[in-house]
Amino acid sequence: MSENKKFRPKKVGNTEQVSEKQHTDTALNISQDNKTSSSSAKRGAKGRRGTKGKSGPANSSQTSNIEGSNALELEFDRDSQLSVLQELFPSWTIDDLSFALEEADRDLELTILHITEGHASKWGEVKKKPIPKTKSKPTSHAPVSDNVSSTFRNATRKSKKPSASKDTSRGVRKSKAGAPSDPSSVHAPSSLEKPAGTGDLPSSEISTKAPASTTVSSSVDPGTINEDSSMKDHTTSNEQASVLTSANTAASTNTNGTAGGTSASAKSTSAADQAVASSKPIKKAWASVAKSKKKVTPAPAPAPESEPSKPSIAPSQPSKTNVSAAYEKPAELSSSSVPFPHKSQDSATPANVETTPSTATSAPKKSTAPFAINAVKPAPGLSNISSASLPKPSFAKQAAVGSQSSTTSMTTARLLSDRFPVVMPVANTAAIPEKVQVRFGSLTLGGEDKKSTKSSSDNIAQSGPRSSYFPKKTVSPKPEAKKEASKVAESTKIPKKQHTSAYESRAPQSKVPENLKESHVNETPYRGLHDVNLPASGNASSVSAIPPQVSAQTTIPAASTSATSGPVVGKQSAGYGGIYSPATHGISPQPYAGASLIPPSTGAAFNNETASSNAGETTALPYSSRFMNPVENRSANSPFDNFQHIDHSTELGYASNTSQQYQQTSHPAYTTMSPIEYGQAAPAAHYYNERNQYSQYDNVAGSASNTPDVHSVMHNKVASSNATSLPAAGTATPSPVVSQQQPQPYAFPPMYPIPYVSYGYGTMPYNNNKFGQPQQGYMSQSGFNDFPPIFGGHSNVYNRQQPGNVSGMSGTQTSNPINNATANTSGMTEKAAGHRDSVIGNGGVTGANSMSSTLGGLSSMSGMGRAAPGMFMGNVGSFENLSANAASPYGLPPQQTPLTNAATQQTTSFQSNANKVNNANSQPAGFPFNSGASTNAGSNGLGGYNAYNQSFINRPGGWYGNA
């Protein structure tokens, strides 16, 4: 067996401790007897396998051959056993399992039982076995230390947090059979017990560091003593001392030789022990153990660090041991020697705990009792272990680390609270609660993040162990935590989303009149009549400068004189594509711009520069539109019946003009128009009986009467003769009346209706026209829409050209038939050569004079009568390029005739619209689309104005139908 023993240690005991234990004497000395005694002592608690140990002598008498064969078998058996153990306990290393197997005399079942019950410890763990049942609870120093150490070890094992050095733990295990006779093994617990039970040790000692040697000796020595002394009849005290020293060395991470290392580990251990003790001062076992244990002078404690913490903690006089002195010094280090700015970090700062992970818990300050740590409770099954015993397992690893981490790792940030000067290092062992809810100085037990959000009171309150003996990791928040939280709350506040379209950012936020507000009205008013940018020149008369005045009138204003305040432009209630557009159901207008969906050329037209009088500059042209997602048609709350009046000289385009004409919106002919949802089939006749009525009046000398010349444009008409409500004959209106373009009901998707936009005398592109009469354009959707263009033409353009020549008129206009308008095919007749109106009807317009646009039948002009309008659809161009198919600056192809290439000619070449008094009876009411009744309306020739339509193309999206 001696050979077998020799063979065994080589395999099993790679560590010094095992070899020391088994080979301290000759192989013969460490024969089966020793193993038997140790195994029996080890198993004393369990009472198993005693027979094998007893039969050791008989086995030793067997032949060496048998022993050799047994050794080989044991070796193979050990390998298989280790493999089984490793599968069962993957967290255990081979060395730990080998050692545990050795302790169980290579009994696999017993080894498993030891490990599962916590009686076997890993190399890094101090605790190894539960309290031997044979031994009484610590009435004497040795038994108490045994119980405490073993129970603590068990707790540690259960927590499965390995202590620092495995070597130490193994060495300790070998030596841990009996009650610790070695004072060094006892002294650490005693010092711990003293702080907890009696508070004899200075709190500084407790709080700072337990010398690594002390920690090891306390945790290991009990085990060592248990094995060696109880099982082995105590090896010589020197042997035990050496074992303890080696254990301490391992525990302190090979710092056993150095007093500093020992003191550091002792500090951490003592701090942990004392912290535990302080956490559970109530346990007398701790106190009794401390008292009973012999004073042992562990490795010389490191130079005492500043002891300010000492005074804060009612220093219980270090009881009789050098260990207490070692503890004192570590305590001094942790509490005061380490200069930590006492910031208002709560004393129970997890960071503090982390910094002193080597120590189990922080020692209580002066008022240790108030901070009694309820949290540190022995794991169930450790009932006999006093809270002081738990701190013991600040193991060699922790002790070694603690010696440095408690000093070096503890940074000034860790000690933030000057209210608690004493800081206890925290033990890393799982058995010890990571955080005891007691503050010592700015440090709390249980290493955690520096940033703690809980109050110190919470830390203290949370004394109960978490999940058996782990207290909740709570740290009192720094004083500024609340502020930070509030800041976070503020930052998390989500500001209400604001609509910031390019248009709105520029639009003056003028209020929408109450009469225009609908339940669906967008509360964000939109800028100005024309939806144009502010002129770069800052023209005060720009649209944005003075928002239009909105009138609630629902009838055409009464006749007035030329002294009226200025042009009045009627828009649909807040005007689609212009002015406010409040009734867009949340769809905000988006003006054309370079970044929009329309071509840059059209976007350029949006940039209005009134200061730029060059007719060739397309950027000087007002433009307004919005591309929006289609919205289903709405008929409710139609805004069509409202007038908007814009005072003279306050809006773009209305420079002083001779007659100060009014312009307003009236659409009585919409009575038969109803909205349909896109995709719906075209309705029956009369459904499209919509008409834009243009009534203009100019009180010019020589006029036969102050009656308006009423014209109406109908587009997309299904045969109907029921249009009604044109202004009564002889009713003079102070200005042209411009109706909104109605959306094409069968267009998919329905188009936004675009209002006529009129610009007066002296403004772009109406250069010095005689009276500055605004022109009205009626635009169709084009290929510039973000929906598939409908080139068939779904809208009409009506332009009135009146150079103001009041000469007699003669001649007759040829018939102007329009498809689907079968009831009114007689066309228009005029007796004055220059009296012309132009209707660009549906793509179905027929006639000798009809002309298709460049977009392929989008709209055609029929008849040359009443002055040729400027109809532009399609590509962009310039004023100078106005040939038949030239592109216009508005993105619209020009009407082919009678336009010329010279912009100047366009303002002068158009026939004048002479006074209609002479032919009032024979002149249908503006257009043949009316009921056919003659309009006794006469009008002086109005000032000529350019034949360019202000280009507003229909936009896809919702529209609101007719009132």
Swiss-Prot record:
The modification Phosphothreonine is found at residue 474. PANTHER family: PROTEIN LINGERER, UBIQUITIN ASSOCIATED PROTEIN 2-LIKE/LINGERER. Residues 119-128 have a biased composition (Basic and acidic residues). Residues 245-272, 306-316 have a biased composition (Low complexity). Its main location: cytoplasm. Residues 1-72, 119-417, 444-517 are annotated as: Disordered. This is RNA polymerase II degradation factor 1. Recruits the ubiquitination machinery to RNA polymerase II for polyubiquitination, removal and degradation, when the transcription-coupled repair (TCR) factor rhp26 fails to efficiently displace stalled RNA polymerase II. Also involved in telomere length regulation. Binds DNA. Ubiquitinated. Proteolytically cleaved by the proteasome in response to transcription stress; the resulting N-terminal form constitutes the activated nuclear form and the C-terminal portion is degraded. The gene is def1.
